Curated annotation (Swiss-Prot):
Record-stated family: Belongs to the GDA1/CD39 NTPase family.
Transmembrane intervals: 7-27, 490-510
Superkingdom of origin: Eukaryota
Disulfide pairings: none
GO CC list: cytoplasm; Golgi apparatus; Golgi membrane; membrane
Reactions catalysed according to its record: a ribonucleoside 5'-diphosphate + H2O = a ribonucleoside 5'-phosphate + phosphate + H(+)
Keyword annotations of the record: Developmental protein, Differentiation, Glycoprotein, Golgi apparatus, Gonadal differentiation, Hydrolase, Membrane, Transmembrane, Transmembrane helix
Active site: E174 (proton acceptor)
Protein location: Golgi apparatus membrane
Tissue-wise expression: Expressed in body wall muscles.
Job of this protein: Seems to be able to hydrolyze ADP, UDP and GDP. Supports mig-17 glycosylation and surface expression, which is required for proper migration of distal tip cells during gonad morphogenesis.
Species, as recorded: Caenorhabditis elegans
Record's protein name: Nucleoside-diphosphatase mig-23
Length: 552
């Protein structure tokens, strides 16, 4: 009876102790990894570029790993292409019918939701940023459109729509976002390790950033970083921080950034045609010789006031360049720009003393199309070669160019591009050299359409800037995870102590039980060998182990 009682005590103790250990282990094993996995889960963001001719949707995603690094944002990829969709017309056309504005964006919201997990949608921010088109409509129309979007869009989508995320942005911020996107795509925000002295730990240094010029249809934008030592002061200087901590200067940048309204290529053509009309009035005719069109190309022009005249191409591109240059210097300029020592862009906007020729600059939009589509000279800028090829092209008869186009000699250019190439070549080069004072021979300028295989959009820069505080959330969660691990680890010390006590208890019980068994056997037979005794003990232990395993 004594053996049976002790064995029962041992079994009951095991039944109580081992389930407790297993329970704690399971809770620890299933809770902590889940928290860690949550910390690494993917987040999403949606942005709409509401331009003058249409609205484009972009969907981005990221995994935040550290609050000491810049947030890493990438486009969501579907079928090997970034998720993107454009709808027309522009948002500004709803100025007279604002009640339809939110419904107009429904297809974009539905597309975005198809590429975002359902459980993520309530935490996915939606940004609607309107640009030039919305800036031009009356204020009451602007407010009516924005009000409709802010009130009705949350009812259309389950994604996160905040009122402050729906607004009209300044042209300056388009430039800032573009600058961020370009440098991000080039990896210029990645930290590099430098050793100040041999044997010391590496210090983090940041790379030199690049500047950008974006030549659109209505305006041109420029943005580049100023050295910290540059004392230049202007309304066009902006200090931005891309990091999530205000006390960290690693991602703080001082930029010169501004928009030149009226200096896009389409506005340039409009100014040029007004200049031609003023010359024609002096001649009392209806047809004027035009050096900025291919030989014998005719174009009938109707101006805003209803006046008509005909441009007839002569293909003299050198003369064209000289005429275009006159359009860049305004008749009136600020007193600062009239000063001989002052440096100004386009003779009107005060600029830093740092020469743009010394800065690595990237040209987008028309700087790419006008050098690449017809001339095939996109990439590293070569002013002499561009002038030579443009002169050769413009001196051709228009009928010859048409024939060459049919033979696919200009596969990337439509007819409108072929008609306007001469003027656009003159405009973009004149803006670069005469407007921004970039040296024709010694410069670091290049035209691009994509970086690392992706088309660079200011929307990416906007998402990076507005999500910059996101890593702080994960940093706080990491701290909670760390503390949770510390707390759970501290539980194992008493558990180990209890395990030791239990093991001691088992040993004592096992010893007493073995003595009793030996005494009983000795009474029945003193002739049992050691091997037989050992076998009996081994068999009994196996039985006990099997019993205990049923409760493990």
């Amino acid at each position: 009876m004594r053996v049976s009682l002790r064995f029962t005590i041992l079994a009951v103790s095991a039944m109580i102790f081992f389930p407790v250990i297993v329970f704690i282990y399971v809770v620890e094993a299933h809770t902590s990894p889940k928290v860690i996995a949550d910390d690494q889960e993917r987040s999403y963001g949606v942005i709409c570029d509401a331009g003058s001719t249409g609205t484009r949707l972009f969907v981005y995603n990221w995994i935040s790993t550290s609050d000491s690094e810049l947030i890493q944002i990438e486009p969501v990829i579907y079928d090997n292409k970034p998720v993107m969709k454009k709808i027309s017309p522009g948002l500004s056309t709803f100025g007279t019918k604002p009640a339809q504005a939110a419904e107009y964006l429904r297809p974009l919201m539905e597309l975005a939701e198809r590429h975002i997990p359902e459980e993520k949608r309530p935490y996915t921010p939606v940004f609607i940023f309107a640009t030039a088109g919305m800036r031009l409509i009356p204020d009451e129309q602007k407010e009516a459109v924005l009000k409709n979007l802010r009130n009705k869009l949350p009812k259309i989508t389950s994604m996160q729509v905040l009122k402050e995320h729906i607004r009209i942005i300044e042209g300056k911020w388009e430039g800032i976002y573009s600058w961020i996107a370009v440098n991000y795509a080039l990896g210029k925000f990645n930290k590099t390790a430098t050793l100040d002295f041999p044997g010391t730990s590496p210090a983090h240094a940041r790379q030199k950033t690049v500047g950008m010029i974006d030549m659109g249809g209505a305006s041109a934008q420029i943005a580049f970083e100023l050295p910290d030592t540059d004392s230049f002061s202007s309304i066009n200087v902006e200090n931005i921080n891309l990091g999530c901590r205000e006390d960290d200067s690693l991602f703080k940048y001082k930029l010169f950034v501004t928009t030149f309204l009226g200096y896009g290529v389409n506005e340039g053509i409009r100014k040029y045609e007004h200049m031609l009309l003023s010359k024609l009035k002096d001649q009392n005719g209806t047809v004027i010789q035009d050096d900025c069109m291919p030989l014998n190309l005719h174009k009938t022009v109707t101006l805003e006031n209803g006046e008509n005249f005909v441009r007839r191409g002569t293909g003299n591109w050198n003369t064209c360049s000289n005429e275009v240059k006159k359009l860049l210097n305004p008749e009136s300029s600020s007193e600062v720009c009239k000063a001989e020592a002052a440096k100004c862009y386009f003779g009107a906007v005060p600029a830093p003393s740092i020469p743009l020729s010394n800065i690595e600059m990237y040209g987008f939009s028309e700087y790419w199309y006008s050098t690449h589509d017809v001339l095939g000279l996109g990439g590293q800028y070569d002013a002499e070669n561009i002038a030579k090829k443009t002169q050769q092209y413009c001196s051709k008869r228009w009928s010859t160019i048409q024939a060459e186009s049919k033979k696919q000699l200009y596969p990337r250019a439509d007819e409108e591009r072929l008609r306007t190439q001469c003027f656009k070549s003159a405009w973009i080069t004149s803006v670069l050299h005469d407007g921004f004072s970039v040296d024709k021979t010694h410069n670091k300028f290049q035209s691009v359409s994509t970086i690392a295989g992706q088309e660079v959009q200011w929307a990416l820069g906007a998402m990076i800037y507005h999500m910059r505080f996101f890593p702080l959330r994960d940093s706080s969660r990491n701290l909670i995870v760390k503390e949770t691990h510390s707390s759970s680890e501290s539980l194992w010390a008493p558990l180990f102590f209890l395990s030791a006590v239990f093991c001691l208890f088992v040993l004592v019980c096992a010893k007493e039980q073995s003595v009793l068994c030996f005494d009983d056997k000795r009474r029945s037979s003193f002739g049992m060998s050691r091997s037989q005794y050992s076998y009996k003990m081994l068999k009994e232990n196996r039985t006990s182990s099997s019993f205990l395993e049923n409760f493990a």
